[in-house]
């Protein structure tokens, strides 16, 4: 009977197709599953690495599962993982509404759910570690205002805003912050389109079509650096030189930093990936022990993060920063792929 049980567990694990683990039984506090929405961009792949290492430092093994941008697959992963009774589930949702039943099932089974990056506010969770996404949009707006001012002598012109997938709260919050800050400048016309599923080819097609119908676009604002790559390619194919049509992005990935160095992109507003990941490990022991988290300011890799108690649960918001040609090589930006060497300090 013991042999059959072990075999069934092994089959279940194989069916889950883990992307990365620190090694079976390598840690003494148990296993955590990280449900990744996709591995199509460097933010997601680097998040797997840093989350795995951060949890390892505090005694947990991590297994990461790729949902391949499919809500049905992510919900199936929830069902499979719940049966394995892990210490916790870390979730970066494909779609913030569709995944709610999975969250509720896990918590009903006594498994804490920690939300990483893609905020969910419609159902209770045990912890949320996010960038200040509305603030990212606000910072982008301030940077864009400066770029338009430098070009025209006043804040005016035409901006193409390319969202990610509209099912992702990350992009909707950036849009909210950006457009709220731009309302004070009625001479700026903003054209908004969404790159469904965060597909880079969709962003390229949007840019190509809009440059045909609106050849006087001054600036293109994309909500992730991997979307900026095809946009820069379209600009080059149309005979544009770096800076002819300005480009701003908002997550700080390596490809975005490279575009800054090459002159195609003027600003990246960084999403603080490393701090968001480390924060999960800082709080995990208290979450697993079902201890109350004290609201307040916490130092996360030198950033002042604010923990508040929201209707959906404890919410840690971490600030981003603008990256330009002047500071693009700063190692604190995750896009330079230099993970933090500072040991994780669990919250007591």
Question: Model-derived features: where do they sit?
Answer:
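Short, solvent-exposed amphipathic alpha-helices that sit
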Residues: 43-58, 136-143, 169-188, 206, ...
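Hydrophobic alpha-helical
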Residues: 90-108, 178, 196-259
């Amino acid at each position: 009977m013991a042999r059959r049980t072990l075999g069934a567990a092994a089959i279940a694990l194989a069916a889950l197709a883990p992307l990365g683990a620190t090694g079976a039984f390598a840690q003494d506090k148990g296993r955590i599953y990280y449900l990744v929405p996709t591995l199509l961009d460097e933010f997601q792949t680097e998040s797997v690495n840093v989350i795995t290492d951060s949890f390892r430092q505090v005694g947990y093994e991590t297994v990461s599962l790729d949902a391949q941008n499919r809500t049905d697959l992510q919900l199936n992963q929830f069902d499979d993982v719940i049966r394995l009774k892990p210490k916790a589930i870390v979730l970066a949702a494909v779609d913030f509404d569709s995944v709610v039943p999975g969250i509720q099932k896990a918590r009903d089974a006594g498994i804490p759910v920690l939300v990483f990056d893609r905020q969910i506010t419609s159902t209770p969770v045990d912890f949320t570690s996010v960038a200040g996404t509305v603030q990212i949009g606000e910072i982008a707006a301030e940077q864009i205002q400066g770029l338009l001012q430098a070009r025209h002598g006043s804040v005016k012109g035409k901006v193409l805003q390319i969202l990610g997938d509209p099912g992702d709260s990350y992009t909707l919050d950036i849009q909210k912050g950006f457009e709220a800050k731009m309302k004070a400048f009625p001479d700026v016309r903003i054209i908004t389109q969404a790159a469904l599923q965060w597909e880079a080819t969709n962003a390229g097609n949007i840019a190509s079509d809009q440059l045909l119908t609106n050849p006087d676009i001054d600036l293109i604002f994309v909500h992730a650096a991997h979307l900026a790559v095809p946009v820069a390619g379209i600009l080059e194919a149309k005979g544009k030189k770096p800076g002819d049509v300005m480009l701003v992005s908002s997550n700080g990935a390596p490809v975005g930093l490279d575009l800054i160095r090459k002159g195609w992109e003027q600003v990246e507003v960084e999403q603080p990936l490393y701090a968001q990941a480390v924060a999960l490990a800082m709080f995990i022991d208290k979450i697993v022990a079902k201890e109350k988290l004290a609201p307040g300011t916490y130092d996360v890799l030198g950033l002042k993060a604010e923990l508040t108690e929201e209707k959906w649960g404890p919410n840690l918001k971490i600030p981003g920063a603008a990256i330009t040609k002047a500071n693009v090589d700063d190692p604190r930006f995750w896009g330079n792929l230099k993970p933090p060497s500072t040991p994780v300090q669990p919250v007591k």
